[in-house]
């Protein structure tokens, strides 16, 4: 698991031609796309030349001649030209509220050097002298030796008040001495369950807190207000619409996060369909499911579906907290720990399934992936899950190859963060030294998984990494950096083609949402969630995928974003 900077490049200038037909027709469409390529994602009709939308539904998919009768005096007609119309993107693992809030705090994303990071933190400290805490995050762990930032460094940048900054992966926190003191962390403080206080040779905390140890400090930080969380979500929604994302899965929600969604929706500002995965406390048992069901029933509405529950099976490889089947290469005798014993995992999974929840599992290490599959299999047996919510396992970084085929046989959705499938500094400095070259081969085996027929979906894990689906698609196709075409491909035998990833981010995402009857393809009767890209991604060089931006996003027949120059 690692982080890639979010793209900040401006979208290229695009022109779309719009016209209105003067004919009258009481059955006229509100919006028609014609004169270009339509990639439907539907195997029964893969391509078309025209699409018509009335209200929030697609009413026509076919050739241009057939759409003429649906064009009336008030119909808006968009001529596609060389551009591509396709279904909207679905991001199956993202943290919109926390990401949006963090954009308004001390934002350390996209920082490539320790010198620049020092400058930005110092600027954050100077910007708001009245703040009781300096908080934010997004920093890359490889900026620090061993992925371990120190309180001494943060003290020099924020000397007079407590500071706590989260790493980009969200699994590591950086505290200054004032924050450690407020939390009461001393050499005598024990590591919490599923957490690590990184210490020096004398046993003193150095300033890095891993996994649940972060909560020792976080519980003392003033919580965000209800308005701050709603405003943060609205920031995230605007960015998502710009990138063509029309549906997403909120990856781990408390009741406060649920309120942010319903607050934004009540104001008409939630323009991304949302599946919410409620946070499961791994230290508690199946008795918590009744409370989760009550939250689901209280907050459910058409645009907000709290129908999933998130279980953290393990941590991350770069922090040494992922659960492995064999020893860490750099720590003989240590394999990492599951966040909950298999018996409890299985009991929670059974209770969630019985209550009608979709199971959404974070699993990084090969042992965590196996334990997750085992928990699903013990409920359903060694057969494909059918007739209920599809379970989904996300991240799925390191596999034992014998477990890859189980996703298809059990009907488990594989949610990839494909943007991580190349050799960046996380991989070279923090991951490969921990697992060695033999196991490294089985990281992110997209092509092998695709050949099994498993349902594959795409996700960003934003704010951990870029929200832009095009960056993830480019990496999946090249197994190289999204910003560099000269680096050696990372196990190139696991490359997939563009269409595989388009399906993952559309129909695969809809299936992960258990909504493929309404979303995921362009077909008559489905919701009109569609996007226009500046060119056909299947026909450009893989290295041009990230330079083929979304220029128009339509949600339920309503335009929610367009390039400012698109309609002149």
Report residues per predicted region.
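N-terminal secretory signal peptides that target proteins for export/translocation
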Residues: 1-5
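Bacterial N-terminal signal peptides
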Residues: 8-19
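Divalent metal-binding segments
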Residues: 21-34, 39, 43-291, 307-368, ...
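Anion (oxyanion) recognition and catalysis
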Residues: 241, 300, 353, 408, ...
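Acidic (Asp/Glu)-rich catalytic clusters
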Residues: 265-268, 294-304, 407-409
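His/Asp/Glu-enriched, well-ordered alpha-helical/loop segment
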Residues: 350-360, 367-391, 396, 401-405, ...
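Ligand-binding beta-strand-loop-alpha-helix segment within the catalytic cores
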Residues: 413
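Glycine- and charge-enriched low-complexity intrinsically disordered segments
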Residues: 562-568
């Amino acid at each position: 698991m690692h982080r890639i900077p979010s793209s900040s490049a401006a979208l290229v200038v695009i022109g779309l031609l719009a016209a209105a037909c003067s004919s009258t027709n009481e059955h006229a469409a509100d919006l028609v796309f014609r004169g270009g390529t339509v990639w439907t994602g539907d195997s029964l009709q893969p391509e078309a030349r025209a699409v018509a939308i009335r209200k929030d539904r697609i009413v026509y998919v076919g050739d241009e001649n057939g759409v003429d009768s649906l064009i009336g005096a008030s119909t808006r007609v968009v001529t596609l030209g060389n551009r591509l119309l396709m279904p909207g993107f679905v991001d199956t693992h993202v943290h919109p509220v926390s990401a949006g809030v963090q954009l308004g705090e001390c934002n350390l994303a996209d920082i490539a050097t320790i010198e620049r990071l020092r400058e930005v933190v110092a600027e954050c400290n100077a910007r708001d002298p009245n703040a009781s805490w300096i908080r934010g995050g997004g920093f890359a762990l490889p900026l620090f030796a061993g992925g371990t930032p120190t309180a001494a460094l943060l003290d020099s940048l924020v000397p007079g008040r407590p500071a706590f900054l989260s790493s980009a992966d969200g699994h590591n926190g950086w505290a200054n001495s004032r924050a450690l003191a407020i939390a009461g962390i001393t050499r005598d403080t024990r590591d919490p369950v599923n957490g690590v206080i990184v210490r020096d040779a004398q046993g003193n905390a150095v300033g890095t807190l891993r996994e649940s140890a972060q909560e020792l400090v976080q519980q003392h930080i003033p919580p965000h207000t209800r308005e701050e969380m709603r405003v943060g979500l609205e920031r995230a929604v605007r960015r998502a619409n710009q990138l063509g994302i029309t549906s997403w899965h909120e990856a781990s929600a408390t009741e406060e996060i649920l309120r942010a969604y319903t607050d934004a929706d009540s104001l008409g500002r939630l323009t991304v369909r949302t599946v919410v995965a409620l946070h499961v406390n791994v230290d508690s048992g199946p008795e918590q499911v009744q409370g989760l069901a009550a939250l689901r029933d209280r907050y459910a509405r058409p645009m907000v579906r709290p129908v999933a529950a998130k279980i953290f099976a393990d941590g991350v490889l770069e922090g040494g907290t992922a659960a492995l089947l064999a020893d860490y290469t750099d720590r003989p005798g240590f394999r990492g720990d599951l966040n909950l014993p298999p018996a409890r995992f299985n009991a929670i999974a059974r209770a969630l399934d019985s209550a009608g929840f979709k199971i959404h599992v974070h699993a990084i290490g090969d042992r965590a992936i196996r334990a997750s599959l085992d928990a699903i299999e013990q409920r359903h047996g060694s057969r494909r899950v059918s007739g209920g919510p599809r379970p989904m396992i996300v991240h799925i970084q390191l596999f034992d190859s014998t477990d890859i085929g189980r996703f298809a046989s059990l009907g488990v959705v594989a949610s990839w963060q494909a943007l991580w499938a190349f050799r960046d500094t996380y991989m070279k400095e923090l991951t490969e030294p921990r697992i060695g070259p033999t196991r490294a081969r089985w990281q992110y085996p997209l092509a092998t998984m695709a050949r099994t027929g498993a349902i594959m979906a795409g996700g960003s894990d934003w704010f951990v990494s870029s929200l832009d689906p095009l960056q993830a698609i480019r990496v999946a196709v090249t197994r190289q950096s999204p910003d560099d075409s000269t680096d050696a491909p990372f196990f190139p035998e696991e490359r997939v083609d563009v269409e595989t990833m388009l399906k993952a981010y559309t129909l695969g995402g809809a299936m992960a949402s258990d909504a493929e009857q309404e979303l995921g393809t362009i077909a008559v009767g489905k919701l009109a969630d569609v996007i226009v890209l500046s060119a056909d991604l299947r026909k450009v060089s893989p290295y041009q995928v990230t330079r083929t931006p979304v220029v128009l996003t339509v949600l339920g027949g309503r335009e929610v974003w367009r390039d400012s120059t698109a309609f002149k």
